[in-house]
């Protein structure tokens, strides 16, 4: 079974394997800006002990046009009603970026 970091990287890099939800603040941007922001999320590799203490690659932030952008991956059960009991198990976990 893949580990949490691998599953998170797959979602983040391909935007496949979970849901991608954009905040209102991102959704109101021009399509080219949204595409650039998503590209920065996909290519993010500045993981440190400070922003990734568990080595799961589930959070990051970067500057875009003078604005701080944050992204996060959360783990839900298959109904999206509760947190997943085991984020390492894709059979019982849905990821949301």
Task: Spell out what each predicted region is.
Residues 2-60:
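Compact soluble domain cores
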Residues 58-97:
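Short, compact, well-ordered microdomains
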């Amino acid at each position: 079974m893949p580990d949490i970091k691998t599953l998170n990287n797959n979602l983040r890099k391909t935007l496949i394997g979970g849901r991608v939800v954009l905040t209102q603040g991102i959704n109101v941007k021009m399509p080219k800006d949204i595409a650039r922001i998503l590209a920065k999320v996909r290519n993010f590799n500045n993981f440190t002990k400070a922003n990734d203490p568990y080595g799961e690659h589930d959070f990051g932030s970067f500057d875009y046009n003078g604005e701080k952008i944050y992204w996060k991956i959360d783990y839900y059960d298959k109904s999206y009603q509760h947190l997943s009991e085991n984020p390492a198990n894709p059979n019982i976990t849905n990821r949301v970026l």
